[in-house]
């Protein structure tokens, strides 16, 4: 299932009695913000909407995404421009400060924070490190092998990997049930893009994120509202995303605040894994399935 379809499906389903986010299995899960999943849908609107109604909300005006029920072409154009620019980046580093609302069964909202560090060298090197109060995970890809290390329990798994980041992301999700944070970033502008209908797109106006001047846009889709802050100037980078789930009365939010480095310094060692002392190697579920199939 594509990332956008997965997000929309999860967001529009009725809340369970526990009302907490669906987590993938055991210590290898990688739930983080699906930043680019939201943006893929917006870019798709430009292609599938033949008639567009112009609605703008500049500073000092009220931006009501729900009541407007229209699409601002400026907002769509901004995301289209951003997506094209992101596809030109060959290497980059991102620090993502994440906040996530968890809604407990009694309706109480508990907010969690995490930090995700990314280092990418296209087409075949990737390093992702996730740190929070209850987890510290490292994902490494060197073009040949994919390794996941759970630092707090000192477990790791290493499996053969395909030759590109895009293929790795698909394999990790489909075969090993591992969803890498911000994985849509690496599918941008490819055949794996999602196209979905957006009910409202609004240009809210200029705003600053961590001292960086951005343009603030708001979007509405059934079950989900989200906002994106895109850096102004020659580097149209996404700087912040806020996603609000509308199917829960508590309206829980997920936010990503991104700091970019477009000229990172690194060597091949950044993507290699040297098991620490006493580290225990474990077998992924996908590996077990392969072994069973070969044994038949």
Segments from the language model and where they lie:
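Bacterial N-terminal signal peptides
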Residues: 33-48
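Signal peptide processing junction and immediate N-terminal pro/mature segment
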Residues: 44-62
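N-terminal secretory signal peptides that target proteins for export/translocation
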Residues: 1-30
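Flexible, processing/modification-adjacent segments and terminal tails
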Residues: 64-80, 87, 149-214, 219, ...
């Amino acid at each position: 299932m594509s990332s956008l379809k997965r997000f929309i499906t999860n967001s529009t389903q009725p809340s369970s009695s526990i009302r907490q986010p669906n987590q993938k299995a055991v210590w290898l899960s990688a739930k983080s913000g699906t930043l680019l999943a939201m943006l893929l849908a917006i870019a798709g609107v430009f292609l599938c909407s033949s008639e567009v109604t112009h609605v703008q909300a500049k500073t000092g005006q009220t931006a009501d995404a729900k009541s407007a029920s229209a699409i601002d072409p400026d907002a769509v154009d901004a995301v289209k421009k951003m997506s094209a620019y992101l596809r030109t980046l060959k290497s980059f580093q991102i620090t993502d400060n994440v906040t996530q609302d968890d809604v407990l069964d009694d309706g109480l909202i508990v907010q969690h924070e995490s930090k995700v560090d990314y280092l990418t060298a296209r087409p075949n090197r990737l390093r992702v490190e996730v740190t929070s109060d209850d987890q510290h995970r490292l994902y490494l890809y060197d073009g040949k092998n994919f390794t996941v290390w759970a630092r707090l329990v000192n477990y790791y798994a290493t499996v053969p990997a395909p030759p590109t980041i895009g293929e790795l992301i698909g394999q990790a999700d489909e075969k090993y049930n591992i969803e890498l944070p911000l994985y849509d970033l690496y599918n941008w502008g490819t055949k794996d893009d999602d196209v979905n209908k957006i009910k409202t797109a609004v240009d809210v106006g200029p705003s600053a994120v961590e001292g960086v001047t951005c343009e603030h846009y708001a979007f509405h889709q059934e079950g989900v509202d989200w906002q994106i802050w895109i850096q102004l100037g020659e580097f149209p980078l996404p700087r912040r995303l806020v996603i609000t789930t509308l199917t829960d009365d508590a309206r829980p939010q997920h936010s990503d605040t991104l700091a970019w480095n477009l000229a990172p310094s690194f060597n091949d060692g950044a993507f290699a894994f040297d098991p620490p002392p006493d580290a225990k190697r474990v077998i992924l579920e996908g590996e077990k399935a392969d072994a069973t199939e070969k044994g038949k």
